[in-house]
Each structure stands twice: as C-alpha cells, then as structure tokens.
Amino acid sequence: MSAFIVLGAQWGDEGKGKMTDYLAEEANVVVRFQGGNNAGHTVVVGDKEYKLRLIPSGILYEDKLNVIGNGVVVDPKALFEEIEYLEGVGVKISPEKLIVSDRAQLIMPYHKVLDKLKEKARGKNDIGTTGRGIGPCYTDKFERCGIRVCDLLHEDVFIEKLRENVEMKNAYITKVLGGEALNFDEILDEYLGFAKKLRPFVQDTSVKVYDAIKADKTVLFEGAQGMLLDIDYGTYPYVTSSNTTAGGVSSGSGIGPNMITNAVGITKAYTTRVGKGPFPTELLGETGDWIREKGHEYGVNTGRSRRCGWLDLVIIKTAVRVSGLTSLAVTKIDTLAGLEKIKVCVGYKFNDTVIDYFPASLEDLAECEPIYEEFDGWDDSVADVRSYDELPENVKKYLARISEFTGTRISIVGVGPKRDQTMRIDNL
C-alpha cells in the first residue's frame, strides 16, 4: 500500500504540476483534493507544453485514473473547456481516466460575480483574488447553502436550490454591491446542459480511492497552491479559501490520515509570490528582475508577474512541521546558475531579537528582517545534468544546507521545466 502527497511548501508556483507529472509514472491514481481552477500549472513533456488548471496532472498518462475529490470546487464550464483543450492537443479524456466526486461543490455564475464585485468594493484593501468564484463557493459550502455535483444530477433538487440561491444572491448583488441581477432561467439552462455531460464522470470518489489503496495500488494526492496560501497557516488574509497543507488531504478526498505514507514538499531554489502581503526575502532590484525573467515567473492563469526573492528556509521548515513532510523536491536549480553569490534566509530579526518561526501577524511579519547565509554560486549550466554526482559542488553544498536546516531529506532535484530534467536522489 502506498499513498503519498505532493504539496507546495511556499506561496504556490513551486513546480507541483511538473513534479506530480513526474511522480505520476509511479502511481495508479492521481487525486486533486482542494482548490479549483484558480491554480494553473504547466507540464512539459518532450517538446509539448500542457497547461492544466482543474484536472489532475496524471491525465497526461494513458493508464492513470484521475480524481477530482470532494474538497475541490468545480466550475463545470471551466472543466469542459479544459477537457476540450486537452483533447485538442491529443490527450484523450473519458470516465475511465477521469472521475468527479458527487460531493464536490459547484461554482455558479453568481460566485464569480460576487468574487469580482466584493474585490472591487475592498478598494485598496483588495486581496488579489483571481475572480473565478473560488472564495464565494467555499463560503456557500460552509454556510450550508452550496450546490453539489449530486444536486445537479437531480433536476428537481437543483432547480429548488438554484432558485433560492439566485434570489438571495441577486438581493445582495443589486442592493449592497450595486451590480446587475443574474437571470435564473439562463443559469438553469446552462447547468442542465452541464448535468448531461458531467453525469458519466460522477462517482463516490472516496470509495474509489479507498479501494485502490486497499488493493495495493499507488495513489498520489496532488495539492494546489502552497503552504503559505493555506486558509489557516498562510499569510492571512492573502490566502486561498481551502486547506493546502497535508491536513486538507483526508477531508478533501475522504481517505483516513493513517493511509497516507509519505508527503513530498515542493520548493523552488528561491522564493516567489503573487499579489500583496509581506515577503521578507523579496528582491526589489536587478537581481529580482533577473530571476523573474530567467525563471519565466509569470502566472499560468493570470499572466501576472511574480515577486521574487531569496530562498526562505524558515518558510520551508514551517511547511515541514505543518504538513509532516518526509522529503523535499527542489526545483529551478537551473534558474540560479550564473549568480556569483546566492543567499538563503535562516531566521528573522524582530524587535531586537532573533526568531526562527513564521509569525501569524502580518504586521509582525512586515517588521521581520531576514538573516542570511551566503553561498558561492555556480556558473555551470545544470540543465543537462541527470545525476546528483554530476551537479556542481556549489549546488551540492546549497542542497545540503537546505536539508540540514529543515531536518528533511531532499528526494528530487529539478534542473529545467521538462519531465526528463528531473533527478531522483533519494526515497520519498
């Protein structure tokens, strides 16, 4: 029995899609357990580039079962657009390769309208939402008025729930936020059309995943976003609306925590984040710009430029603790090639004291000054390296310090965006 998790250990965009694709070769089942189509990732196989948002990365293999779990919020329109895109580039999609939980919450048109209007109303205090309705959908889930996939497949139930929601949301949209009312009949027609297309893919995915584990098949749980975007442990309120840490796996997939054997944390060799919020190691000058351009640090979904900075080991150590990471995968070693000196943060100066933890308060975090250790860089291009022994000595020293500080083995190193630019150096 083997069930392991792939999680982001930073603010997202660490290369989880690539690592999931790489590790999916060892898996029989790949499961998304949280988030929605707000988290895009790119997978490069040979000369082909695939951009995924909602569908698990295992879809690029012919023989893997891909699962959208109950913890995911599903926009049917986005799902079928992604299916159409994948089929257009030669990836076959069928209910034998992809299943969707009957317990997953549906993103509705009013969720997207609310997302954008509320963000506009926040003014300078906006939180940088993607506007895809993720937060409002999770809000409805916890207010117990959300519409689930199973509701969509029962037309009478769906009509009743949709009518109640549209009435309530229209009142709020028009009277409080100053927006235009949505048309009930238009939404109904559109979603009844989705119901017919979605029905063949719908199952009790918890049972399917449980049975796979019990049958000694290998299951990979694919996280979206990263630890610092977790609703509880992230830089709140500049976070997503779900649990991106290992704690979200059981509730988002219906599998007990005792069935999970390993958790791999993905980290870049440096740090990036999108949007607002404190960023202790951010590089605002030429070095930050150089990393951004060389690393192509722009969002898959939004195209927004990412803020770049030195690797913050306090963050990685926090991710190890919160998610019980058993190993780390370090990506984008190749991006740093060419820098004379490279720094890593090993603590913060705060109120005339030294701390080695990540503060909950954003105000406190904003006052933290990073304490750096400096390493010699590497001029060698590492993009063609395929074994640990061939890596430059300075890269090995850099990786050794990451492992030493976090108390965690490094199992995988990435030296480029392609599937074959990945080397396994230890067990997960």
From Swiss-Prot:
Any single Gene Ontology cellular-component annotation: cytoplasm
Catalytic residues (UniProt): D13, H41
GO MF annotation list: adenylosuccinate synthase activity; GTP binding; magnesium ion binding
Gene Ontology terms describing biological process: 'de novo' AMP biosynthetic process; IMP metabolic process
InterPro entries assigned: Adenylosuccin_syn_GTP-bd, Adenylosuccin_syn_Lys_AS, Adenylosuccinate_synth_dom1, Adenylosuccinate_synth_dom2, Adenylosuccinate_synth_dom3, Adenylosuccinate_synthetase, P-loop_NTPase
Biological or metabolic pathway of the protein: Purine metabolism; AMP biosynthesis via de novo pathway; AMP from IMP: step 1/2
The protein's Enzyme Commission number: 6.3.4.4
Superkingdom in the source lineage: Bacteria
Catalytic activity reported: IMP + L-aspartate + GTP = N(6)-(1,2-dicarboxyethyl)-AMP + GDP + phosphate + 2 H(+)
Residues given in the record as substrate binding sites: V300, N301, T302, G303, R304, S305, R306
Cofactor(s) required, per the database record: Mg(2+)
Record's keyword annotation contains Magnesium: yes
Known partners and oligomeric status: Homodimer.
Function: Plays an important role in the de novo pathway of purine nucleotide biosynthesis. Catalyzes the first committed step in the biosynthesis of AMP from IMP.
Family per similarity comment: Belongs to the adenylosuccinate synthetase family.
HAMAP family according to UniProt: Adenylosucc_synth
Full protein name: Adenylosuccinate synthetase
Organism, as annotated: Clostridium beijerinckii (strain ATCC 51743 / NCIMB 8052) (Clostridium acetobutylicum)
UniProt gene name: purA
